[in-house]
Regions:
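Carbohydrate-interacting regions of secretory-pathway proteins
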Residues: 1-155
Length: 155
C-alpha cells in the first residue's frame, strides 16, 4: 500500500538489535519530496536530504519551538511556527531543496521559506555540499512510519 514501517530487527528473545536506514540508490541535486509520516509518542526519526541535511521527524507536539522540532533543519533552522499534530496522527511534509536553499511545508503551513543551508547536519554521510546525494530515512531512533513518498527531481 506504499507504506514503509520502521520495525526493529529482534532476536527470538525480543531484545532490540538495531533499526536500519532506508536510502535511495539514486543521488539527487535539486528536488521536491512529499510524504506522510506517523510518529508515535516519544519517537523520532529524520529525513536526510542529499545525505547531508536532516529534517527532524519527532514527537514535538505542544513543546516549545526550537531547531529540534518536527520539520526543523536539525540544529540549524527553527520552523517559523509549530504545525505538529498529536503523536500517532499522520502528518504531511512537502520539502524542496534547490541549490542549498530549503523550503518546508508541514501540514499545509510553510515553516521554512527558501532559507539557505550552511553545512551538513549531524549524521551526514558526506561533507561534499556541491555534489548530489541520496535521500535517506533515519531508522535508529524509534517506530516511525512513512507512506505516500513522492520524490520529484527539479531540473
Amino acid at each position: 500500500d506504499g507504506m514503509i514501517v520502521n520495525d526493529p530487527i529482534q532476536p527470538k528473545d525480543g531484545e532490540h538489535i538495531s533499526y536500519g536506514n532506508i536510502r535511495t540508490l539514486q543521488e539527487f541535486n535539486d528536488f521536491n519530496l512529499k510524504l506522510e509520516v506517523n510518529v508515535p509518542e516519544g519517537n523520532n526519526s529524520g529525513i536526510y536530504l542529499r545525505g547531508l541535511y536532516e529534517i527532524q521527524v519527532v514527537d514535538s507536539y505542544g513543546k516549545e519551538l526550537d531547531s529540534h522540532n518536527m520539520g526543523a533543519l536539525y540544529s540549524r533552522i527553527t520552523p517559523s511556527e509549530a504545525a505538529e499534530k498529536p503523536a500517532g496522527e499522520w502528518q504531511t511534509l512537502d520539502i524542496t531543496l534547490v541549490d542549498r536553499h530549503l523550503t518546508v511545508i508541514f501540514n499545509g503551513k510553510k515553516i521554512i521559506d527558501n532559507q539557505p543551508v550552511w553545512g551538513p547536519t549531524g549524521g551526514a554521510i558526506s561533507s561534499d555540499v556541491l555534489s548530489p546525494g541520496p535521500i535517506y530515512l533515519q531508522g535508529d531512533h524509534g517506530n516511525v512510519a512513512y507512506r505516500n513518498i513522492v520524490l520529484t527531481p527539479i531540473k
